[in-house]
């Protein structure tokens, strides 16, 4: 860690503590050259994989896009917003757990469908109808039948 006062490279950690909910570490450091003390905060950087669309275009994972798609399916449904946020967190964890740098939109869509199936069956059908591009009533009926199994 470079000293913010003299830019020296040699610093030592005097004290380390967890901050808040334990997701951050506060470190008290001292420069070995100028002896000034300063504080740093460290957090884990959780990198999300890039998303590869069906046409081959690659784009950064967009949590807002994920949330808006789920909320559109859940519109006017009796689902707690905390449950939605937990589902989004779980989906993000599953994507990070793949260890891949890139994931297909199909995988993201399937994770969303799994989450919606647990949250609200009507929202699941709404999302599936758009995601799977249902063409007629028969396809709706088949999906509903699978849901009841």
From Swiss-Prot:
Keywords associated with the record: ATP-binding, DNA-binding, Metal-binding, Nucleotide-binding, Repressor, Transcription, Transcription regulation, Zinc, Zinc-finger
Record has Signal as a keyword: no
Protein name stated in the entry: Transcriptional repressor NrdR
Cofactor list: Zn(2+)
Keyword Metal-binding found: yes
HAMAP family documented for this protein: NrdR
Domain ATP-cone, residue spans: 49-139
Signal peptide: none
Cofactor: binding comment: Binds 1 zinc ion.
Matches recorded under InterPro entries: ATP-cone_dom, NrdR-like_N, RNR_NrdR-like
Gene Ontology terms describing biological process: negative regulation of DNA-templated transcription
Residue spans, zinc finger unnamed: 3-34
Any GO MF annotation of the entry: ATP binding
Protein role: Negatively regulates transcription of bacterial ribonucleotide reductase nrd genes and operons by binding to NrdR-boxes.
Domain of life (superkingdom): Bacteria
